[in-house]
Amino acid sequence: MAEATQSVLIQYIIVQRDQVPIGWRILADGRYERTAADNALPTPTEPLDRDRALNWQPTGTITAEQIQVIEKTARDSGFFNLQPRLLINYCKDDPGVAIWTVNVDGQQKRVVVYDPKPKRAAEIDKLKALLTELIGA
């Protein structure tokens, strides 16, 4: 399914030069999707941190209570206080990126983490741990 105007609650996408983008998103109505395998590789000169149209594969649904847990975790984690770009240990020539987008209570935040790995930002680690627990992301 191609990206549409659905309301995204939380989404993360990992983009690397030599791999198709991978990621998950949960829509405001509780449906969750993962990136489809037929997405194209980034071009050799394309900035990895730009938003791109992706195909998504429906995967399941979470409950209203689980949506509330995600919203609370996003608010309480400090995610909305992060800088828009996290250049942590930035020493690679063309590092991959993780692009996180969260929409809660009318507030939207997009954070790009360069060379994404666990323990780059505690705020993001909390959200990632919750997504792993809820949907296996």
Stretches with model-predicted labels:
Residues A28-Y32:
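Structural signal for glycine-centered tight turns and loop->strand junctions in beta-sheet-rich domains
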